[in-house]
From Swiss-Prot:
It comes from Bos taurus. It holds the Pfam family DNA_pol_delta_4. As a component of the tetrameric DNA polymerase delta 4 complex (Pol-delta4), plays a role in high fidelity genome replication and repair. Within this complex, increases the rate of DNA synthesis and decreases fidelity by regulating POLD1 polymerase and proofreading 3' to 5' exonuclease activity. Pol-delta4 participates in Okazaki fragment processing, through both the short flap pathway, as well as a nick translation system. This is DNA polymerase delta subunit 4. Its main location: nucleus. A motif (PCNA-interaction protein motif (PIP box)) lies at residues 1-16.
Length: 107
């Protein structure tokens, strides 16, 4: 009785050489020295609203607008951030600002 066959026996053994520049898997890519672009005012405000959507302490956000959620949290004494209210008041008709992060996902 011979050696027990393994599934890897059917695949050829491939030995890899290091690249011409001597790169190996453990090395990081060189730093290009580029910094990320600063966010625009709208992008900063949208990020603030996304963080508000993800903050569970103000209650669920599905099925209502961000402004409705902010008012509900205020009525319940949960002290929602006033910056969120200011952003929502400054963009009254824009669905990007008024609708929650989950608005475009079906319930």
């Amino acid at each position: 009785m011979g050696r027990k066959r393994l599934i890897t026996d059917s695949y050829p053994v491939v030995k890899r050489r290091e690249g011409s520049a001597g790169h190996s898997k453990g090395e990081l890519a060189p730093d290009l020295g580029e910094e990320p672009l600063p966010l625009s005012v709208d992008e900063e405000e949208l990020e603030l609203l996304r963080q508000f959507d993800l903050a569970w302490q103000y209650g669920p956000c599905t099925g209502i607008t961000r402004l409705q959620r902010w008012h509900r949290a205020e009525q319940m004494g949960l002290k929602p951030p006033p910056e969120v209210h200011q952003v929502l008041q400054s963009h009254p008709g824009d669905p990007r600002f008024q609708c929650s992060l989950w608005h475009f996902y079906p319930l």
